Each structure stands twice: as C-alpha cells, then as structure tokens.
C-alpha cells in the first residue's frame, strides 16, 4: 500500500514539476530568418532596428545573431544563410517590438523593404507588416503604453 502511494505521489510530483517548468518558460526559444545576401540583410536590420550582430558559422550556415540579454524578456534568433534557408512571405510571422512604429516603417521602406500591412491600432497596441530585403514578411508591434 505504501509503495503504491509513493508511486502515485512520485507520478503526481513529476507531473507538477513538468507543468511548473513549462509554465516558467516561453514555448518559443529561438528563431531564424532566412536570407539570400547576408551583408544586405544585416545592413537592413541594423539600420531599421539599430541592431548590432555577432556573426558565426553554425553547421556550415552563415549566421548573424540578434542581440540578446538574459535580463530582458523575449527570445532571440539569427539571420541565417545557407542551402536550407529560403526567404518567404508565406510562413511563420515574427513580431519585432518597436517604440516608434512610424519611424520603423519609414526606415524599412527607405532601406529596401516594402510595407505589406500598414500601421493598424488593435485592442492591444499597434501592428504592421513589411517585406524585408530578402523577401520575408516581418511584423511590428508597439504597445499602447
């Protein structure tokens, strides 16, 4: 009887621990944006968002890593160039945070991007979408605060 009680308790504890761990972290931890021309793409994202990239090679693919700090919320990722990476407007949509939607859209448009969905005020903030220099659809978000 005691062993079956402990077995049940252990299973329950394992489930609670797993649930707690899953609730303490965001489900998405990393992203990669496909690029054709790494220099053009890093110049675009550096200009539009004022990002500084660290570059590296991972599994024979060129990567330009977006800035990341453990102290801030959110995830990070990379611009990725390689045979397996194909830019698209039809796939996953990544939202970048911005403090000034109008300026970010202006910079995207004047640096080779195209506005796909104009600034729109929805119930949680401002959103917009643009095509980057590589042909990817990228979204913007600005909070109402």
Roles of regions detected by a PLM:
Residues 2-4:
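C-terminal motif of bacterial Sec signal peptides marking the signal peptidase cleavage site
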Residues 22-28, 32-74, 110:
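Core segments of cupin and vicinal oxygen chelate
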Residues 87-108:
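Mid-chain, well-packed structural core segment of small domains
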Residues 62-64, 92, 126-128:
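Short beta-strand micro-motifs in enzyme catalytic cores
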Residues 6-26, 30-33, 54-57, 105-145:
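Vicinal oxygen chelate
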Residues 72, 85-86:
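Active-site/binding-pocket entry motifs
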């Amino acid at each position: 009887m005691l062993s079956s009680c402990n077995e049940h308790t252990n299973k329950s504890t394992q489930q609670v621990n797993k649930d707690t761990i899953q609730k303490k972290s965001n489900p998405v931890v990393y992203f990669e944006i496909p690029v054709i021309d790494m220099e053009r793409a890093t110049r675009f994202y550096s200009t539009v968002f004022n990002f500084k990239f660290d570059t590296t090679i991972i599994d024979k693919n060129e990567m330009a890593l977006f800035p990341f700090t453990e102290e801030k919320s959110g995830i990070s990722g990379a611009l990725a160039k390689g045979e397996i990476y194909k830019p698209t407007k039809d796939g996953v949509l990544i939202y970048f945070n911005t403090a000034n939607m109008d300026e970010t859209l202006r910079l995207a448009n004047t640096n080779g991007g195209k506005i796909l969905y104009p600034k729109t005020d929805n119930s949680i903030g401002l959103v917009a979408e643009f095509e980057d220099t590589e042909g990817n659809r990228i979204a913007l978000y600005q909070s109402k605060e």
